Amino acid sequence: MQIPETSSVHQNEWQRDVFVLSSGTCLPQQKAEVYRAHLAQIQYAWANSEISEASAVHLFKKYAEKYSAILDSDKLEIGLNNYADSILTMAKCQRNESDKWQSSLTTNNVLKLKSVQEMAEAGRRAQLSLLNSTDASVRVGNEIGTSGYSTVLAHNVLRNPSHAVPHAASSDCQIPEGSSNFLQNSKVSAFTKANTSSNTLINNSIPINTSLMQRNEVKAPTTFSTQSGPNVFSSTTSVYSGKRKACYALGDESTDIQPKPLVQRQLASKEATGDSDFKTAKEQLWVDQQKKHSNQPQRNPGPLYGGGKKSLGAARSRGLHGKFIPPLPRQEDVEDSNRKVYGQGNSEMNSTSDEHLKNIEPKMIELIMSEIMDHGPPLNWDDIAGLEFAKTTIKEIVVWPMLRPDIFTGLRGPPKGILLFGPPGTGKTLIGKCIACQSGATFFSISASSLTSKWVGEGEKMVRALFTVARCHQPAVIFIDEIDSLLSQRGEGEHESSRRIKTEFLVQLDGATTSSEDRILVVGATNRPQEIDEAARRRLVKRLYIPLPEASARKQIVVSLMSKEHCSLTEQEVEAIVLQADGFSGADMTQLCREAALGPIRSIQLMDISTITAEQVRPIAYIDFQSAFLVVRPSVSQKDLELYENWNKTFGCGR
């Protein structure tokens, strides 16, 4: 069957899409699909140099505008209404981050409130009273000035002698426009009161409500700081309620007037009393977080939408009905820590490896390192029976160049790919693994299923990540079992994702971005070599035929397997078994020995199977192999052997 050219196929698709657009029954969904197909075809044509860059930009802009007009139109007749409730419902659980997001709650808006203006007026009246008399009393009731704040501030300052008032007064805070009177008056009244009547505060000139102080210690006060963002004030409704829920504290990040958190104060009190055996989940989590972030520099958090709760006033203590905080870290924290640990670099990787892996997703690297990279026991060439020509050829072109790259340079360099084809069960997988073991290379074993994904674009990303990790672990051997399923011939009815995976694999194997110094060998094994794509066959330079084992190889398999069992076979009986097993593959010989090993077990009576010991089981005899030949048959037909031999004569590199 003659395959049509790619250009004719794309032309037919373009004409079909134009007819769909011109029809009067075309729905908006169909129009969007057509324009999306046009964009993909334009990108494909530009990538293959079929059109110029200027033409591609012009066409892409033209159809992108048409596509956007259909998506964003709110009319059901001509658009899809991209801002409909159904679309927003799908995206409502997604995190929305934006550096340009600004809150509508600003300091100027708060200062315009009536209650805040009354507080400012009360502060000015308190300032006048302080100027007239240094020993002013504090009124607690419906009208409270900032002298109440000065009482609390002075009490906190006097409790901590290290926090002197001049040190606190040296901290400057940024006062927004329009709020200078209120903040300056409050600041002047606070520190004037703290300086002139500190002794009076200790005595009884100004009464201090101890219950008020306890409540203020429990709740973390809101501070005016030099950080960017809207300043948060205490609740204005509590000013006239007679219950002070929070106090103000002036100072920037350099001041230490702020009280410690509740959990830290509780831990300190428990350690002082000696009762520190039991810790709640919240306390334990706080301790773990302090240990975790003790050596890390503090940084401003990113602008997360909904990440931090903004409120007016201090947080209300939730008590028993509060949110439960588990003592174990969250899954997001574990993933972030794992990424940080991995980002610090493995001791086996140099700086070049880190540069290669920085653009690869950590999950893909972890998948390749844990599942695709093989960590099985080592193999020797003696473990593979027969196949002397294949083993000798592989040693010459693969193993020796990897062991001595200084000698095998230039034209003596190893090939990029090897294809092992032949009947199933002849040891192709063992040869691929033995190459990695004998050359000291890292062995990657993949299949078509390990590179496919239900998400668009994930397959080619996995292929790119595989070769990137292999370049970081050179020398490396990438073994592809059943390579015909991954690199089959590309046709018209092939899925687009499968085509992209093949293209990416061929580019990584031998493309413009590959380096001749990379010591990466791709070994493919297949029992259907006629289905491999022509481009892949060209890149797999050495194509070795792995035939059925000869008589000497079959004898070696029988002797090797029977040496581990209790048997009574003579040399003549072994020769007879080998001659009778003509046409058997290596896997068939193994199955034959397994079936013969069950012969002594089948000869035991059913009533004696539970009481007989292992020493009383008779050895494996020649009659057991005769019974096994009645059950086990060759898995390769003569017709298949002729197909392999003909393909070997046409494309093979063997004798």
Swiss-Prot record:
Predominant localisation class: nucleus
Binding site for ATP: A385, G425, T426, G427, K428, T429, L430
Pfam families: AAA, AAA_lid_3, Vps4_C
Region Disordered, annotated ranges: 289-313
Family matches, as InterPro entries: AAA+_ATPase, AAA_lid_3, ATPase_AAA_core, ATPase_AAA_CS, FIGNL1_ATPase, MT-severing_AAA_ATPase, P-loop_NTPase, Spast_Vps4_C
Catalytic activity: ATP + H2O = ADP + phosphate + H(+)
Name the record gives this protein: Fidgetin-like protein 1
Species annotation: Xenopus laevis
Organism classification: Eukaryota, Metazoa, Chordata, Craniata, Vertebrata
Gene: fignl1
